Each structure stands twice: as structure tokens, then as C-alpha cells.
């Protein structure tokens, strides 16, 4: 099967397929993703002062984020299962109502993060 040069998940007939990575060498691979969450001042204050009755929001979000990163192959079509060797999620309040979230992942394998 010959692959398209523009997009590796399409063959020359334009059909979608999962890329064969069986002959690729293992290498260390890393990724960093980040974004901002903007919220009402009252919401930010409740999170920062831990006034949410269900528990500490950022700790729950950290666990959920790590779980989601480990299961990326279930969320992105044609994504290979990647055994993460590290996943770290950090939060940083940029201002009163803006929370920056960063996720760093690492693996050693034949396909990356």
C-alpha cells in the first residue's frame, strides 16, 4: 500500500487507515499542551479559597487530566495507544479570572505524544 505524501493517514486512493509503526525505532518523545480557562470572578474565588463543597477542584481536574491523557487513543480517531512514562499537569492563575493549564507528557516508543 502506497501512502499519500501530504497526510500519512490516507492512502493513494484517499482511504483512511491506521499508520503501521511496527518498523519504527523507539525514541523518547515529549509534548506540551496548554490553554487558558476564563471564568467569573466568583467562580475563581470559590476555587482559590477551596469553597466548592465537592472537593478541591484543581486536584480533581489534575486527576481527570492525567486520566484523559492516558486514554488519548480513545478520543482521537486513528491514534495509537501510547504508554505514557510521565504526565504532569500544572495550574497557574494568570490573573483574577484566568487559569492557565499546562500538560507535559513523555514516552519512549515508536509513536509519539
Regions found by a protein language model. Give the residues of each.
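C-terminal binding/interaction regions
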Residues: 2-58, 63-80, 84-113
